[in-house]
């Protein structure tokens, strides 16, 4: 009977040590997860804003080189195309400014409407002046 009590007491001590070890392992796992979260957030990748900003900057550079590489004879058709693109931008900007809630998209949509309108009307004025150069002068 004494051997049985010693054996039971040994099992109780072993189970107590196993419980303490599991609690310690759980605390270490929690601590490790808290240490990893900031690193995981930092390596998550660029936000959507930076992707869109990169596309915008690349579009500006490509547009600059396309416009300045065009021969003078093709500037009139190029202006017509940019006016058409600006009208599409105005439609998209009107959709962006549509929601009632005040947000960044509403502000950016307003500026898009403003800049595209300046581009459209300026293009019409320049086109009108260019066409006036080809009219016969009245005597």
Curated annotation (Swiss-Prot):
Keywords: Cell inner membrane, Cell membrane, Membrane, NAD, NADP, Translocase, Transmembrane, Transmembrane helix. Signal peptide: none annotated. The chain crosses the membrane at residues 49-69, 78-98, 107-127. The keyword NAD applies. It holds the Pfam family PNTB_4TM. One of its GO terms (cellular component) is plasma membrane. It is found in: Cell inner membrane. InterPro entries: NADP_transhyd_a_C. It comes from the Bacteria. It is a multi-pass membrane protein. The transhydrogenation between NADH and NADP is coupled to respiration and ATP hydrolysis and functions as a proton pump across the membrane. This is NAD(P) transhydrogenase subunit alpha part 2. The lineage of its organism: Bacteria, Pseudomonadati, Pseudomonadota, Alphaproteobacteria, Rhodospirillales. The gene is pntAB.
């Amino acid at each position: 009977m004494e051997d049985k009590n010693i054996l039971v007491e040994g099992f109780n001590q072993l189970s107590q040590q196993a419980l303490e070890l599991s609690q310690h392992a759980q605390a270490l796992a929690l601590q490790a997860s808290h240490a990893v979260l900031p690193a995981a957030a930092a390596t998550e990748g660029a936000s959507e804003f930076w992707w869109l900003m990169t596309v915008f900057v690349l579009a500006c550079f490509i547009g600059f080189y396309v416009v300045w590489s065009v021969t003078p004879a093709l500037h009139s058709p190029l202006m017509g195309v940019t006016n058409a693109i600006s009208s599409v931008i105005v439609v998209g900007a009107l959709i962006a400014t549509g929601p009632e809630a005040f947000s960044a998209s509403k502000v950016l949509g307003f500026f898009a409407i403003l800049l595209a309108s300046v581009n459209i009307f300026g293009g019409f004025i320049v086109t009108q002046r260019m066409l006036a150069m080809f009219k016969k002068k009245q005597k």
